[in-house]
Amino acid sequence: MRPSDRTPAQSRPVTITRQFTAHAEGSVLIEFGETKVLCTASFTEGVPRFLKGQGQGWVTAEYGMLPRSTHSRMDREAARGKQSGRTQEIQRLIGRALRAAVDMKALGENTIVIDCDVIQADGGTRTAAITGACVALVDALNWARGKGLIKTNPLKFLIAAVSVGIYKGEPICDLEYVEDSAAETDMNVVMTETGKIIEIQGTAEGEPFSHEELLSLLDLAKHGIREIVDVQKAALS
C-alpha cells in the first residue's frame, strides 16, 4: 500500500496554470500533487557564439529550488558560490529533453531560455519541470509567431515526464518524496506525446532490478505520461 493510498499505476493530480506571471513569453505553474514548479520561457533574438551563422536556434534551461521549497531551509546556491552537481544534471536534462521537441532550423537564429524554479518539493521536481516547461515553450513559440519573429511553428511534438520506481518490491508511478526516499529503484522517463522515449534515467538505489521489472516500469511511465499529456493538451486548448 502506498502512503497516499494511490494504486501502483496512479499518478498524482496534475494542474497546469498558464500565463502565471506577466513578463515572460511563456509562463506556467505546474503542480504534481504537492510538488509545485514555476516554469518560464524567454524568447530572445540571437544565438550563442558557437551557433552564429548556422541558421538555427537554441533552447537551454536553468533549474533551481527556492530555499524553503523543502522541509527545512537550504541556502541559495548563489550564496554558496556554485551550483550543485544535482542542479547541473537536472537543468541539462531539461534542456536536452526540450531540444528534442524543437526543429532548430525552423526556430531560426533565436534562443529560448527555460527557467524552472521549484516552489515546493515533494518528489518528481525534474519531471514536473520538464512537463511544465514544455507548455511554457509552446506559449513562447506562439508568441514569437504572433510577432512575426518566426515563420512556422518549430514544435515537433509535446513532451512530458514522470518518475517511476520500485517501492517495497512493487513497481509504482509518480513517486512522492516519502516513496522516492525509500525506493529500491528510482527512474525518470521522458517521452513524446506518442509514447516514444527521449530519455531514461534509472538507478538501483537498493536492490538491482530485473529486465522484466524495467519493462514494467516503462509501461507504467508510458501510461502515466499519456495521462499527463492529456492535461497539457487540455491546458493548451
Swiss-Prot record:
Q: Which UniProt keywords apply?
A: Nucleotidyltransferase, RNA-binding, rRNA processing, Transferase, tRNA processing, tRNA-binding
**Catalysed reactions, as listed in the record:** tRNA(n+1) + phosphate = tRNA(n) + a ribonucleoside 5'-diphosphate
Gene3D superfamilies with a match to the protein in the record:
GHMP Kinase, N-terminal domain
Principal EC category: transferase
Q: Name one GO molecular function term.
A: 3'-5'-RNA exonuclease activity
Q: Which GO terms of type biological process are on file?
A: rRNA catabolic process; rRNA processing; tRNA processing
Q: Which InterPro entries match?
A: ExoRNase_PH_dom1 (IPR001247), ExoRNase_PH_dom2 (IPR015847), ExoRNase_PH_dom2_sf (IPR036345), PNPase/RNase_PH_dom_sf (IPR027408), Ribosomal_Su5_D2-typ_SF (IPR020568), RNase_PH (IPR050080), RNase_PH_bac-type (IPR002381), RNase_PH_CS (IPR018336)
| Domain of life assignment | Bacteria
Question: What EC number is given for this enzyme?
Answer: 2.7.7.56
Q: Name one Pfam family in it.
A: RNase_PH_C
Q: Binding residues for phosphate, per the UniProt record?
A: R86, G124, T125, R126
Function of the molecule: Phosphorolytic 3'-5' exoribonuclease that plays an important role in tRNA 3'-end maturation. Removes nucleotide residues following the 3'-CCA terminus of tRNAs; can also add nucleotides to the ends of RNA molecules by using nucleoside diphosphates as substrates, but this may not be physiologically important. Probably plays a role in initiation of 16S rRNA degradation (leading to ribosome degradation) during starvation.
Instruction: Name the family the entry cites.
Output: Belongs to the RNase PH family.
Oligomeric form and interacting partners: Homohexameric ring arranged as a trimer of dimers.
Provide the protein name.
Ribonuclease PH
Q: Which organism is it from?
A: Shewanella loihica (strain ATCC BAA-1088 / PV-4)
Q: Which gene encodes it?
A: rph
